[in-house]
C-alpha cells in the first residue's frame, strides 16, 4: 500500500468559484479516488487562501470585516466542492492559529540560517488611496514583451516576472492614478542561495511535466532573484514577528504553508503521524501538488527551496493543468460563458461536467475547451446512450424472468477476457493522469458490450420458445460488462456509480476486482441512473450567467438617507449641565404593582443611588446585576409612589426594544462621561 498525500491549490476566498476553477479540482479528485480504489492510503487536503489586500479592500467596500468575508466565501466554496463531488479529507483555512504557528516557525528557521535579509526598496504607492500597492493592484505594460494590461508581478502573455516598479505606464487598480515610488524596508528570502537545492529536486523528479521543466530551465537562465516576502500595513494577514504589525507576510509565503496546516489538522483529528508523510525522512511517502499553470513559479522554485531548508519533504511532483475556455474562447461574462460553479449546479448534475472534463484531460498542460454543443452530445451519447443503456436493456429480463439472479455461467468467455485484458491499460492511464485515454478505452469496451447485446437481441429471444437459458446468459453477461465499466468510471462519476452499485447489490469492489464477473448474484430492480441533457438546460445556464452580469452592472438605486427626529438644538453649555456618570448595578428587583419598572441600586464609586427604570419588558433583574451602565447623576430626585428615584439610566430604543447603554471595558464607577 502506497502512502500518498495530495493537495490542491487553495481557492482565494474573495469571490465565488467558476468552472475554470472546477477543472483543476475535478482532475485531482479523479486521481485521488482512483488511488483510494486501489487500496492506497491517499489523503486529500485543501483549504481557503484568505490573506492579502484584495480581501481587505473588498471587505471594506462591503462594510464587513475580512474575517467575515473569508468565512462567507470559504463556506460557499466548500458547498460548491461538496456538490461537485470533490471529496477532500480535510478543508482548512490559512487564517488560522495553526497556520500562523507554522508560518512563524518556518520563517524563524529561514532567518536562523541567514536566508532572510532586510533592505529598503522603492514601492508603488497610491497617494490618493494613501497605501502601498500590492503587485496585483498595479497594472501596466509588460517590460519584457510589451503586452498591455498586465499585473505588477508577472505577465500572463510571456510568463515573465518583475517588480511593479518595472511596469511601463503603471496605474493603480484602486484609484486609476499613476502610483509614485516610495521607499520602504522589506524582508527578502535568499532564493539564489538555494539554487542547488532546487536543481537537485528537479533532477530527482521523474514525474515533472516537460512544460514545467522547460519553464524552470528558462527561469534559471534568467537568474534567480531574492524574493520579497513582506508587505506593508495596512494588510490582512500575519504580522512578521518584531515589526510592531507594520510589516506582514506576503500571502504567497503563508498560502502554500496552508497545505501543511490542513494536513497537520487532519493528522491531529485522526491520530496520524505527520512525519510519516511530510517529515524530511519520510522517503516511503509521496507528496503531490495539483495546481493551475499560472502558479508554477511559486510551487516549483520558492516552495521546494523553503521545504528543503526547513526540514520538510519536498514534493514528489507538481502537476499543473491548463485554463478553461468555453466554445473556443476565453470565458466571458458578456457572452454568458463565465459560468459560476453554483450556476451550473442549479441546472445540471455534476456527473456530466466531471465526465466531459475527464474525456479531455491529459497529463500535459493544455488548455481545455468546454464546447457546450459537444458537452451535451458526449454526455447523452456516452453516459446515457452507451453505459447506462447496457443495464437498462438487460436488467428487466433478469429481474422479472430469473428471480433477479445472474447466470451461473459465462456466455462469452472471449469477450469477458477482452474486458479483463484492458484492465492494466486503463489502470496505467489513470495513474499517469491520462484520463482522456482511459475514457476512450472504457467507451470502446462499452461499444463492444452494446454490439454484443445488439447481435443477440435478448428482447427477440425472450419471445422464442426454448431460448430462456440463452436470454439469461446474454443478459447476465450484459449486466456483468456494465458492472466492469462502472467500476472503471467510479473515479469520474461517483454518484451515478453509487446508484449503479445499489442496483447491482454490491457494497464495494476494489479496483483489482473490477474485471471479475458476478456469478449467481442477486441484483435489485433497475431504476434510471441518468437522464439526457436537454439543450434548454444549457441555454438557461448561459441566460442565468448573463443576468448575473446585468445585476452586477445595474446602477444601484440611491437609498434615501434616513431621517432622524432630532430634538431642539441645545448649546454646549446646556449639554455640560448634564452630569453623566459610569454606574455599576449592584442590585436589581421587580417593583410590586408596576408593569414597566425595575428598581436599580447603582454604585457611582462609593456613592449609592436608587433609580426606577422602565426596562422591565427587556431585562430580567438577575441579568443586570454586575453590569456597568451610564446614568444622569444630577437629575433632580423624583418622588414616586414606589419610592424616591435619584437619577436616570440611559437606554436606546426604536419602539420595538429597549437597550441600556454599557460603557467600554475599563470605564470605572464614578467616572464622568464627557
Curated annotation (Swiss-Prot):
Under Enzyme Commission nomenclature, its number is 6.1.1.10
**Gene Ontology MF: a single term:** tRNA binding
**Which enzyme type, at the first EC level?**
ligase
Q: Where in the cell is it found?
A: Cytoplasm
Amino-acid positions noted as binding ATP in the UniProt annotation, renumbered to this chain? 333
GO BP term (any one) = methionyl-tRNA aminoacylation
Q: Name one GO cellular component term.
A: cytosol
Motif 'KMSKS' region, residue range(s) on this chain: 330-334
Q: Which Gene3D superfamilies match?
A: HUPs (3.40.50.620), Isoleucyl-tRNA Synthetase, Domain 1 (1.10.730.10), Methionyl-tRNA synthetase, Zn-domain (2.20.28.20), Nucleic acid-binding proteins (2.40.50.140)
SUPFAM superfamilies to which the protein is assigned, alphabetical:
Anticodon-binding domain of a subclass of class I aminoacyl-tRNA synthetases, Methionyl-tRNA synthetase (MetRS), Zn-domain, Nucleic acid-binding proteins, Nucleotidylyl transferase
Q: Which InterPro entries match?
A: aa-tRNA-synth_I_CS, Anticodon_Met, Met-tRNA-synth_bsu_C, Met-tRNA_ligase_1, Met-tRNA_synth, Methionyl/Leucyl_tRNA_Synth, MetRS_core, MetRS_Zn
| Cofactor(s) required, per the database record | Zn(2+)
> Which residues does Zn(2+) bind?
142, 145, 155, 158
Motif 'HIGH' region: chain residues: 11-21
At the top level, the lineage of the source is: Bacteria
Protein role: Is required not only for elongation of protein synthesis but also for the initiation of all mRNA translation through initiator tRNA(fMet) aminoacylation.
Per the record, the similarity remark reads: Belongs to the class-I aminoacyl-tRNA synthetase family. MetG type 1 subfamily.
User: What subunit structure does UniProt give?
Assistant: Homodimer.
Name by which UniProt lists this protein: Methionine--tRNA ligase
* Gene symbol of the encoding locus: metG
Amino acid at each position: 500500500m502506497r502512502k500518498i498525500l495530495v493537495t490542491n491549490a487553495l481557492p482565494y476566498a474573495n469571490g465565488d468559484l467558476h468552472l475554470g476553477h472546477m477543472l483543476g479540482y475535478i482532475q485531482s479528485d479523479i486521481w485521488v479516488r482512483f488511488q483510494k480504489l486501489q487500496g492506497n492510503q491517499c489523503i486529500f487536503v485543501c483549504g481557503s487562501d484568505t490573506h492579502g489586500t484584495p480581501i481587505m479592500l473588498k471587505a471594506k467596500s462591503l462594510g464587513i470585516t475580512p474575517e467575515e468575508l473569508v468565512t462567507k466565501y470559504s463556506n460557499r466554496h466548500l458547498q460548491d466542492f461538496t456538490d461537485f463531488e470533490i471529496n477532500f479529507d480535510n478543508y482548512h483555512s490559512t487564517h488560522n492559529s495553526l497556520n500562523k504557528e507554522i508560518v512563524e516557525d518556518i520563517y524563524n528557521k529561514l532567518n536562523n540560517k541567514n536566508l532572510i535579509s532586510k533592505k529598503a526598496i522603492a514601492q508603488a504607492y497610491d497617494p490618493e488611496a494613501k497605501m502601498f500597492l500590492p503587485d496585483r493592484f498595479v497594472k501596466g505594460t509588460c517590460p519584457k514583451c510589451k503586452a498591455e494590461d498586465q499585473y505588477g508581478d508577472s505577465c500572463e502573455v510571456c510568463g515573465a516576472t518583475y517588480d511593479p516598479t518595472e511596469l511601463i505606464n503603471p496605474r493603480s487598480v484602486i484609484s486609476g492614478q499613476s502610483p509614485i515610488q516610495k521607499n520602504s524596508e522589506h524582508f527578502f528570502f535568499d532564493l539564489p542561495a538555494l539554487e542547488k537545492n532546487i536543481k537537485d529536486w528537479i533532477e530527482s523528479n521523474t514525474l515533472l511535466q516537460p512544460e514545467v521543466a522547460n519553464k524552470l530551465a528558462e527561469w534559471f537562465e534568467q537568474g534567480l532573484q531574492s524574493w520579497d516576502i513582506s508587505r506593508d500595513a495596512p494588510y490582512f494577514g500575519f504580522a512578521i514577528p518584531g515589526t510592531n504589525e507594520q510589516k506582514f507576510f506576503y500571502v504567497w509565503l503563508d498560502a502554500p504553508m496552508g497545505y501543511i496546516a490542513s494536513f497537520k489538522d487532519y493528522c491531529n483529528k485522526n491520530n496520524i503521524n505527520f512525519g510519516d508523510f511530510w517529515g524530511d525522512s519520510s522517503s516511503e511517502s509521496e507528496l503531490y501538488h495539483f495546481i493551475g499553470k499560472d502558479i508554477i513559479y511559486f510551487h516549483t522554485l520558492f516552495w521546494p527551496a523553503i521545504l528543503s531548508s526547513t526540514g520538510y519533504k519536498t514534493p514528489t511532483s507538481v502537476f499543473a493543468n491548463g485554463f478553461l475556455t468555453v466554445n473556443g474562447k476565453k470565458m466571458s461574462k458578456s457572452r454568458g460563458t463565465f459560468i459560476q460553479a453554483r450556476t451550473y449546479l442549479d441546472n445540471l448534475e455534476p456527473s456530466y461536467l466531471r465526465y466531459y472534463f475527464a474525456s479531455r484531460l491529459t497529463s500535459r498542460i493544455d488548455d481545455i475547451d468546454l464546447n457546450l454543443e459537444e458537452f451535451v452530445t458526449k454526455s447523452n451519447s456516452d453516459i446515457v446512450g452507451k453505459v447506462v443503456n447496457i443495464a437498462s436493456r438487460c436488467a428487466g429480463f433478469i429481474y422479472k424472468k430469473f428471480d433477479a439472479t445472474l447466470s451461473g455461467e459465462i456466455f462469452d468467455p472471449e469477450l469477458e477476457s477482452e474486458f479483463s485484458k484492458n484492465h492494466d491499460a486503463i489502470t496505467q492511464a489513470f495513474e499517469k493522469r491520462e484520463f482522456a485515454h482511459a475514457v476512450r478505452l472504457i467507451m470502446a469496451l462499452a461499444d463492444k458490450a452494446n454490439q454484443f447485446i445488439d447481435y443477440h437481441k435478448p428482447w427477440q429471444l425472450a419471445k422464442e420458445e426454448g431460448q430462456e437459458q440463452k436470454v439469461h446468459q446474454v443478459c447476465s453477461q450484459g449486466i456483468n460488462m456494465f458492472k466492469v465499466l462502472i467500476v472503471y468510471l467510479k473515479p469520474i462519476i461517483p454518484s451515478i456509480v453509487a446508484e449503479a452499485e445499489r442496483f447491482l447489490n454490491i457494497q464495494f469492489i476494489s479496483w483489482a476486482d473490477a474485471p471479475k464477473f458476478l456469478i449467481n448474484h442477486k441484483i435489485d430492480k433497475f431504476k434510471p441512473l441518468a437522464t439526457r441533457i436537454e439543450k434548454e438546460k444549457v441555454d438557461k445556464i448561459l441566460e442565468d450567467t448573463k443576468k448575473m452580469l446585468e445585476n452586477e452592472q445595474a446602477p444601484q438605486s440611491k437609498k434615501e438617507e434616513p431621517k432622524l427626529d432630532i430634538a431642539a438644538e441645545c448649546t454646549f453649555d446646556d449639554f455640560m449641565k448634564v452630569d453623566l456618570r459610569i454606574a455599576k448595578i449592584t442590585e436589581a428587583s421587580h417593583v410590586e404593582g408596576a408593569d414597566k419598572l425595575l428598581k436599580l441600586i447603582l454604585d457611582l464609586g462609593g456613592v449609592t443611588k436608587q433609580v426606577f427604570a422602565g426596562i422591565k419588558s427587556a431585562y430580567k433583574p438577575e441579568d443586570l446585576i454586575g453590569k456597568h451602565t451610564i446614568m444622569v447623576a444630577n437629575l433632580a430626585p423624583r418622588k414616586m409612589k414606589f419610592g424616591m428615584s435619584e437619577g436616570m439610566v440611559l437606554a436606546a430604543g426604536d419602539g420595538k426594544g429597549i437597550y441600556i447603554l454599557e460603557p467600554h471595558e475599563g470605564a470605572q464607577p464614578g467616572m464622568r462621561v464627557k
